[in-house]
């Protein structure tokens, strides 16, 4: 699992004074989703985590300080905090995974399974993000080979698949 906090924004509210929202990017098993959290939510998580695992220090909250430089330092500190929790703990607590909106799948014995893969899918937030492993610049079956030399292996395989009743030349 990889966690980053690429940005933050100031949110104004009619009911209370404004606050800062941190955008958390979570990458897990080739999937990426975003979660937005306030500093108070990070602080509440930290208090709960301290009871069950060893936690790094959380950046301090400067009371009502919306100076961009201070907020950027806090963003970096919170990102480092999340990454340190992941690095220092082999098994992450459920409340940490819930904070990041990650579905917790307990490890099962090899004889058990979850049924269909679709049941373990999370909703919209888990879109695949991957890169192609193999890329053809031209269709190898439609366009002829650029070289004049015949590809004996491919011809043999195609001959064996499509014309098994004929003897090779």
Swiss-Prot record:
<dbReference type="InterPro" id="IPR052467">
    <property type="entry name" value="Sorting_nexin_PX-domain"/>
</dbReference>
<keyword id="KW-0446">Lipid-binding</keyword>
<feature type="binding site">
    <location>
        <position position="40"/>
    </location>
    <ligand>
        <name>a 1,2-diacyl-sn-glycero-3-phospho-(1D-myo-inositol-3-phosphate)</name>
    </ligand>
</feature>
<feature type="modified residue" description="Phosphoserine">
    <location>
        <position position="113"/>
    </location>
</feature>
<keyword id="KW-0007">Acetylation</keyword>
<dbReference type="InterPro" id="IPR001683">
    <property type="entry name" value="PX_dom"/>
</dbReference>
<dbReference type="Pfam" id="PF00787">
    <property type="entry name" value="PX"/>
</dbReference>
<keyword id="KW-0472">Membrane</keyword>
<protein>
    <recommendedName>
        <fullName>Sorting nexin-24</fullName>
    </recommendedName>
</protein>
<keyword id="KW-0813">Transport</keyword>
<dbReference type="GO" id="GO:0030659">
    <property type="term" value="C:cytoplasmic vesicle membrane"/>
</dbReference>
<feature type="binding site">
    <location>
        <position position="74"/>
    </location>
    <ligand>
        <name>a 1,2-diacyl-sn-glycero-3-phospho-(1D-myo-inositol-3-phosphate)</name>
    </ligand>
</feature>
<feature type="modified residue" description="Phosphoserine">
    <location>
        <position position="116"/>
    </location>
</feature>
<feature type="domain" description="PX">
    <location>
        <begin position="1"/>
        <end position="125"/>
    </location>
</feature>
<dbReference type="GO" id="GO:0015031">
    <property type="term" value="P:protein transport"/>
</dbReference>
<dbReference type="GO" id="GO:1901981">
    <property type="term" value="F:phosphatidylinositol phosphate binding"/>
</dbReference>
<feature type="binding site">
    <location>
        <position position="61"/>
    </location>
    <ligand>
        <name>a 1,2-diacyl-sn-glycero-3-phospho-(1D-myo-inositol-3-phosphate)</name>
    </ligand>
</feature>
<keyword id="KW-0968">Cytoplasmic vesicle</keyword>
<keyword id="KW-0653">Protein transport</keyword>
<comment type="similarity">
    <text>Belongs to the sorting nexin family.</text>
</comment>
<dbReference type="InterPro" id="IPR036871">
    <property type="entry name" value="PX_dom_sf"/>
</dbReference>
<feature type="modified residue" description="N-acetylmethionine">
    <location>
        <position position="1"/>
    </location>
</feature>
<feature type="binding site">
    <location>
        <position position="38"/>
    </location>
    <ligand>
        <name>a 1,2-diacyl-sn-glycero-3-phospho-(1D-myo-inositol-3-phosphate)</name>
    </ligand>
</feature>
<keyword id="KW-0597">Phosphoprotein</keyword>
<comment type="function">
    <text>May be involved in several stages of intracellular trafficking.</text>
</comment>
């Amino acid at each position: 699992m990889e966690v980053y906090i690429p940005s933050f924004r100031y949110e104004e509210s009619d009911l209370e004074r404004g606050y800062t929202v941190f955008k958390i990017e979570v990458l897990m098993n080739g999937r990426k989703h975003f979660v937005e959290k306030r500093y108070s939510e990070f602080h509440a998580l930290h208090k709960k985590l301290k009871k069950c695992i060893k936690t790094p220090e959380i950046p301090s909250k400067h009371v009502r300080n919306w100076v961009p430089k201070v907020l950027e330092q806090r963003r970096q500190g919170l990102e480092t905090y999340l990454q340190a929790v992941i690095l220092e703990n082999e098994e992450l607590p459920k409340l940490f995974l819930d904070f990041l909106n990650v579905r917790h799948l307990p490890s099962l014995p090899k004889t058990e399974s979850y049924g269909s893969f679709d049941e373990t899918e999370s909703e919209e937030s888990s879109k695949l993000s991957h890169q192609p492993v193999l890329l053809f610049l031209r269709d190898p079956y439609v366009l002829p080979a650029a070289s004049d030399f015949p590809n004996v292996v491919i011809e043999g395989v195609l001959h064996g698949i499509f014309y098994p009743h004929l003897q090779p030349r």
